[in-house]
Amino acid sequence: PVLQVVRDIHGDILTPDSRYIL
């Protein structure tokens, strides 16, 4: 499946799984 990749305010690449691991 294709994961939606977004960037937080620091420019870090976040995925649905990693966005909770800050």
Curated annotation (Swiss-Prot):
Tubers. It comes from the Eukaryota. Coiled coil: none annotated. GO terms for molecular function: cysteine-type endopeptidase inhibitor activity. Inhibitor of papain (cysteine protease). Does not inhibit trypsin, chymotrypsin nor elastase (serine proteases). May protect the plant by inhibiting proteases of invading organisms. Belongs to the protease inhibitor I3 (leguminous Kunitz-type inhibitor) family. This is Cysteine protease inhibitor 4.
